[in-house]
Amino acid sequence: MAEGLGPILSRSARLMRRVQQLEQRVTFTVTTRTISGERVNPLRNARESAPIERLMAHADKRGKVAERLKALGFEIVHEGWFGIVVRGPAALAAEVLRTKLMLQARAGLSRIRSTQIFRHNPGAPLPEELFVAPTQSLSLPASFSEDADDVIFEPPALYFQPVSPSPVACTYRIVDDATVRRYLDVPVGQTGAGSVVGLVDTGFYPHPFFGTNGFDLEPIWAGPGDLPEVDEVGHGTAMAANIFTVAPGAKVKGFKHDLDLPSHIALERAGAPESGVDVISCSWGFEDEQTFGVLRSTIRKLVSDGKIVLFAAGNAGVRAWPASMPEVIAVGGVYADENDALMPSDYASGFASSRYPGRIVPDICGLCGNAPRGIYLMLPCAPGSRLDKLQAVTSVSPGMAFPDADETEESDGWAGASGTSAATAQVAGLACLLLAEARRLGKTLDNVRLKALLTASARAVPQSAGGAVPNTATGFGLVQAARAMDELSRL
């Protein structure tokens, strides 16, 4: 295992149970021969490559690799567009792949700062932050079959955010739903009805907030043992609320991202034709622009298929990927103070990509709180979930108050939070408004056209990096629904 991890794990029965589970359930992706013959994984940083349809797995060869893996003793979890997701004992994986595997811990949820993610974890990891991967690289050639290309290990993704049906009372300023819609210039009567968002996140608790307000949230059941309505983290439930704030008439389908599995599985399910999804909202990513070939190809296919794909730019200095992919719409954060003055959020990330020359992140922004903890919106979450506990007074320190705690209880199902996670979900809701208006006008919007509408109509933020746009503070600025609709009418 990674240096220094042993003593930490030995003090926690919960962590040791997770270690025992990983010894028997290591998960990895095998990319198989593609239709074009190009390998998918080496293209993860490429500016250009073959048309995405040519990079999809050759069906016959994928089938042969699956049979070979089953014969070797592995479980086939998922046969997808670009390869196969496999699960099996760590010892078997190390033997078949001819590599040394190491137990590692991803940087995780801070107990002492910022709503969700930061780079270096000062305390014990959470169970879901443990993973197994090779010691030298997260990918290696697949030597067990002539029809397989590469083996890829994907660490758990980072989530950038962080029971009464009504928000709890607090003594500090919270931006309510009506104020969010005002700042985003949402016209009265626009609800996004008829639009469908595929929200890929941690789970979707049936909070009474949704039913009381008549919001249409449908957790999608993906197979035996799947429990999409269970949200131990609380993040997915909160993100759904942000979508409905802007587009109360939209439908949100929740695709649970099991952190034991590669993220492309949930994205494929969300993008399948039978899902009926128009917009795919992703408030997560990987820091330092760490890239994965199968995930990149999956996103390219979603965009090619006409889906709107949004990713959060990250919080607290994280340089997030896939947000830096030029194909996606990257969302950052703008803070509006009590006098309605707009400024870049000092909690939201922004950067010039080192992977894609000339790429500025974010493209546009939603609303986001400021450091130290991003407490700005009061969001529903699963009672007792990680998000519920994270901001509560008793979790931070008895007697602590805003801006260091949200003044809520650890199991009341509400959390003061924000981040580029929340901003991304808001923009997903705004995309629903524009898609509904496009249908009314008999027009079609794809990812490229929608990004152009959002950037052309955004409200520039004066304090951003000298005032020029786009910039690494707020991109083109804060999204504006009414202006975007005017732009749409002129297309």
Report each predicted region and the residues it spans.
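C-terminal subdomain of the subtilisin-like protease fold in secreted/lumenal serine endopeptidases
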Residues: 277-281, 410-414, 436-491
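N-terminal domain-start motif of subtilase-like serine proteases
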Residues: 89, 153-197, 224-225, 344-353, ...
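Active-site alpha-helical elements of protease catalytic centers
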Residues: 200, 213, 222-257, 414-436
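Acidic-leg catalytic submotif of subtilisin-like serine proteases
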Residues: 179-225, 311, 364
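Substrate-binding/access-modulating region of protease and related hydrolase catalytic domains
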Residues: 238, 254-328, 338, 408-425, ...
